[in-house]
Swiss-Prot record:
SUPFAM superfamilies: P-loop containing nucleoside triphosphate hydrolases
Provenance organism: Homo sapiens
Subunit structure: Interacts with AKAP8 (via C-terminus).
Phosphothreonine, modified sites: T400
Name the record gives this protein: Fidgetin
Length: 759
C-alpha cells in the first residue's frame, strides 16, 4: 500500500518500507513535553524521514528543500518561542543531559545566568501550534525512545558529526566549502540541495514570514547576497520561489550537543548511517541558487581546501568533513620523530669492501658516511630534564656530570656552560647512543671494567676549574672532516706499521689479548711539514675517537703558568670522551733533557704529563691513544724514550707522493701543464717537504694575478684569469726553497737506526 501526502502543492509518496519505523520519535502533539524534547523530535523526523526519503529518491529535490525549510522554521520556533523554562541552559535537563532525548533523572542544573537577563525572542509565537498539523500529515509516527544519530539496520554506536541547526545562540561550525573559489559558502547554513537535473538559477529573496524583533526594528540587517557563481549542473531553467529565512543570533548559550539535522555552512550531510549502501549522496549547490538560512558568522577562519570538480569533488568534501568530525585531520607532526634507530651492535672491524668509495669506506674499518663525519667532533652535552631538575639549585662545582653527547660549539668560541656537562659514556644512560656515533668504537674487555674508575673521574671533574674545561673544549679539542689513508700522500711503510701495530690491537683487543701491553703511545719524529699531524687525525678518524691537539710550544710560551693544569684537564676530559686520541706536538719542549730546575713550571708540566701518560699505559680501562710528534728527537731525555712503545720516522715525500700533492693542489684551479712539465716539477721538488710543495703551488697559482693590470682585484672574475703554466712555477722556484737541510735528514736517519721502529 502506497500512501501520499501533499506539501506546498507537491506530491510526496511513501512506500511500505517507511512503516518499519513505528514509534521511533517523540509525540510532537503532546502538551507535556518540554521544548528540549520537541526539538529532539524535529531532529529525529528530519534525519529519519526527510533525509532517508530524499536519499532513496522517494521525494523530489524541490520537495526536500521545502520540507527542510519547514522543519527548520518549526525547530527554530520552538527554541525562540515564549515558553516558560525552569532554567536557561543548553536545553538539557542537566549538564549531563543526553542528546538523544532520553530522560535524565538528575536534578536540574542551576546556572548563574537567569532568564530575566535574556532578551526575549517572540519571532514565531504560534509555530508550535501550526507545526502539529503539518508534521502529523506529512510524517509517520515516531517513537520517542529512538536515539538521535542512528538509522535502521545500522549499529547505534556509530556516531555522526554534530550539525548545529538553531540560530538562537547556536554555535556555527566553519564550513569546509568556504574556501572553494567556485562556491562561496557563507559561514552560516544555506540548506538548499537540488538534484543533478536542476540548475542553479538565483531566486529573489523574499521576506521572512516570521521576522524577528531585531529584524523588524532595523537593528539587525541581513548581509548582502554574494555574486552568483556559474551553474554547476545545467538542464533546469526554472526560477525557484522559495523564501529566505534569516534568523539573528540571540542570547542563548552555544549548543555543543545538538544532534545531526542539517549542516551549517552549506556542507552536505556526510556519508553516515542513514544512507543505505549503493545510494549516491545528494549534490550540494551554491547558496545563491536557492536562498536558504543565513546565520550570523562566528568569526572563525574556515578550512579552505583546494578546488574540487565533478562528482569526485563532492565525495572528497564529504570525506574531509567527516574526517574532521571524527578528529582525523590533525596535521601537527611536530611531536613525532621520524629518525630511524641505529643498532648498537656493529662489528668493530671489517675487511675492506672495494665496491664502496673511499670517501665512505675509509680503509675498510666499516665506517659509514653518516658516522664518519662525527668521528672526532666532541661536544658539550645538554643536560637531561631530570638532571636539570636535580641540580638546578646547586652550584656549578657540585654538579654531577650528565651523559655525553656529540654537538659542539664552533672552534675558538668561549662557552659559558659548566664543566659539569661532561662525563664518561660508560657511566651515563646515553652511553650506547654515544658509541653509536663513533665509527669504530674501541670495544673490548676493558670497556666493561671502565666503570670502576667513573667515581674518581666524577670527583676530579667536580674539583676542576670551569675555565680549564672551557679552554680544553675550545682550544685543544679539534674537529674537522674525517681523514682517510688515501688523503695522506706517500708514507706507505708508516701507514702499514700504524695499522698492524696500533690500530688492529686497539680495534680487536680480543685477538691480541695475549700481549702484555697494547701500544697506546707513539712517537712520530721527522722534518716539519711531512704530515705528522695529519697522521694523528687519520688515526683518530679510524678509531672514531675525539681528537685532542696540544701544542708543546704553546704550553711553554703561552700557557706556562697553567700548563700543568691544562694537561691534567685535557686527560681528564679525554677519559670522559673515550675513545680519545691526544696529539702533542713539539714534545721535545716538555721532555727536553736540558730542564734541570726541579720546581720550575716546565718541570712541573713534564711531571704532570709523564704521570698522566703512565696512567694511560698501565690502565686497562682507559681507551686513550697518545701520539707525540717532534722534529728534534735527539733533545728528548734518554730515560723518557721508554714511554713511547712505537717510534716512527716520517720522512720527506718521495716522487710519487710529490706528484700526488701537486695534482691535488692544482685540481681546484685552472692550469695548463703537460706530463713532461709535471715530471720536471716532481724532479725539481726533490728535498721538499709536503708543506714546501704546498707553498710552491700556492705561489704559482698567484702568478696569473700578477700578470693582470693594476686594477681592483675584487672586480676580476675567475674566468678572466689565464691558466697556471710552467712559467709560473719557474717564478715560484725563485722564492720557495727547501726548508730541510741534508744535515738534518742525515740526523733523522741515524736516530731512526738507533732508536726508531720503522725499519
Amino acid at each position: 500500500m502506497i500512501s501520499s501526502t501533499s506539501v506546498y502543492g507537491l506530491k510526496m509518496q511513501w512506500t511500505p518500507e517507511h512503516a518499519q519505523w513505528p514509534e521511533q520519535h517523540f509525540d510532537i502533539t503532546s502538551t507535556t513535553r518540554s521544548p528540549a524534547h520537541k526539538v529532539e523530535a524535529y531532529r529525529g523526523h528530519l534525519q529519519r524521514t526527510y533525509q532517508y526519503a530524499w536519499a532513496n529518491d522517494d521525494i523530489s529535490a524541490l520537495t526536500a528543500s521545502n520540507l527542510l525549510k519547514k522543519y527548520a522554521e518549526k525547530y527554530s520556533g520552538i527554541l525562540e518561542g515564549p515558553v516558560d523554562r525552569p532554567v536557561l541552559s543548553n536545553y538539557s535537563d542537566t549538564p549531563s543531559g543526553l542528546v538523544n532525548g532520553r530522560k535524565n533523572e538528575s536534578e536540574p542544573w542551576q546556572p548563574s545566568l537567569n532568564s530575566e537577563a535574556v532578551y526575549p525572542m517572540n519571532c514565531v509565537p504560534d509555530v508550535i501550534t501550526a507545526s502539529k498539523a503539518g508534521v502529523s500529515s506529512a510524517l509517520p509516527p515516531a517513537d520517542v525512545s529512538a536515539s538521535i544519530g542512528s538509522s535502521p539496520g545500522v549499529a547505534s554506536n556509530l556516531t555522526e558529526p554534530s550539525y548545529s541547526s538553531s540560530t538562537c545562540g547556536s554555535h556555527t561550525v566553519p564550513s569546509l566549502h568556504a574556501g572553494l573559489p567556485s562556491q562561496e559558502y557563507a559561514p552560516g547554513y544555506n540548506g538548499s540541495y537540488l538534484h543533478s537535473t536542476y540548475s542553479s538559477q538565483p531566486a529573489p529573496a523574499l521576506p521572512s514570514p516570521h521576522p524577528s524583533p531585531l529584524h523588524s526594528s532595523g537593528l539587525l540587517q541581513p548581509p548582502p547576497p554574494p555574486p552568483p557563481p556559474p551553474a554547476l549542473v545545467p538542464g533546469y531553467n526554472g526560477t525557484s520561489n522559495l523564501s529566505s529565512y534569516s534568523y539573528p543570533s540571540a542570547s542563548y548559550p552555544p549548543q555543543t550537543a545538538v544532534g545531526s539535522g542539517y549542516s551549517p555552512g552549506g556542507a552536505p550531510p556526510p556519508p553516515s548511517a542513514y544512507l543505505p549502501s549503493g545510494i549516491p549522496a545528494p549534490t550540494p549547490l551554491p547558496p545563491t541558487t536557492v536562498p536558504g538560512y543565513t546565520y550570523q558568522g562566528h568569526g572563525l577562519t574556515p578550512i579552505a581546501p583546494s578546488a574540487l570538480t565533478n562528482s569526485s569533488a563532492s565525495s572528497l568534501k564529504r570525506k574531509a568533513f567527516y574526517m574532521a568530525g571524527q578528529g582525523d585531520m590533525d596535521s601537527s607532526y611536530g611531536n613525532y620523530s621520524y629518525g630511524q634507530q641505529r643498532s648498537t651492535q656493529s662489528p668493530m672491524y671489517r675487511m675492506p669492501d672495494n665496491s664502496i668509495s673511499n670517501t665512505n669506506r675509509g680503509n675498510g674499518f666499516d665506517r659509514s658516511a653518516e658516522t664518519s663525519s662525527l668521528a672526532f667532533k666532541p661536544t658539550k652535552q645538554l643536560m637531561s630534564s631530570e638532571q636539570q631538575r636535580k641540580f638546578s639549585s646547586q652550584s656549578s662545582r657540585a654538579l654531577t656530570p650528565p651523559s655525553y653527547s656529540t654537538a659542539k660549539n664552533s672552534l675558538g668560541s668561549r662557552s659559558s656552560e659548566s664543566f659539569g656537562k661532561y662525563t664518561s659514556p660508560v657511566m651515563s644512560e646515553h652511553g650506547d647512543e654515544h658509541r653509536q656515533l663513533l665509527s669504530h668504537p674501541m670495544q673490548g674487555p676493558g670497556l666493561r671494567a671502565a666503570t670502576s674508575s667513573n667515581h674518581s673521574v666524577d670527583e676530579q671533574l667536580k674539583n676542576t676549574d670551569t675555565h680549564l674545561i672551557d679552554l680544553v673544549t675550545n682550544e685543544i679539542i679539534t674537529q674537522g672532516p674525517p681523514v682517510d689513508w688515501n688523503d695522506i700522500a706517500g708514507l706507505d711503510l708508516v701507514k702499514a706499521v700504524i695499522k698492524e701495530e696500533v690500530l688492529w690491537p686497539v680495534l680487536r683487543s680480543d685477538a691480541f689479548s695475549g700481549l702484555t701491553a697494547l701500544p697506546r703511545s707513539i712517537l712520530l719524529f721527522g722534518p716539519r711539514g711531512t704530515g705528522k699531524t695529519l697522521l694523528g687525525r687519520c688515526i683518530a678518524s679510524q678509531l672514531g675517537a675525539t681528537f685532542f691537539k696540544i701544542a708543546g710550544s704553546g704550553l711553554v710560551a703561552k700557557w706556562l703558568g697553567e700548563a700543568e693544569k691544562i694537561i691534567h684537564a685535557s686527560f681528564l676530559v679525554a677519559r670522559c670522551r673515550q675513545p680519545s686520541v691526544i696529539f702533542v706536538s713539539d714534545i721535545d719542549m716538555l721532555l727536553s733533557s736540558q730542564v734541570n730546575e726541579e720546581h720550575s713550571p716546565v718541570s712541573r708540566m713534564r711531571t704532570e704529563f709523564l704521570m698522566q701518560l703512565d696512567t694511560v699505559l698501565t690502565s686497562a680501562e682507559d681507551q686513550i691513544v697518545v701520539i707525540c710528534a717532534t722534529s728534534k728527537p735527539e733533545e728528548i731525555d734518554e730515560s723518557l724514550r721508554r714511554y713511547f712503545m712505537k717510534r716512527l720516522l716520517i720522512p720527506l715525500p718521495d716522487s710519487t707522493a710529490r706528484h700526488q700533492i701537486i695534482v691535488q693542489l692544482l685540481s681546484q684551479h685552472n692550469y695548463c701543464l703537460n706530463d713532461k712539465e709535471f715530471a720536471l716539477l716532481v724532479q725539481r721538488t726533490e728535498g721538499f717537504s709536503g708543506l714546501d710543495v704546498a707553498h710552491l703551488c700556492q705561489e704559482a697559482v698567484v702568478g696569473p694575478l700578477h700578470a693582470m693590470p693594476a686594477t681592483d682585484l675584487s672586480a676580476i672574475m675567475p674566468s678572466q684569469l689565464r691558466p697556471v703554466t710552467y712559467q709560473d712555477f719557474e717564478n715560484a722556484f725563485c722564492k720557495i726553497q727547501p726548508s730541510i737541510s741534508q744535515k738534518e735528514l742525515d740526523m733523522y736517519v741515524e736516530w731512526n737506526k738507533m732508536f726508531g721502529c720503522s725499519q
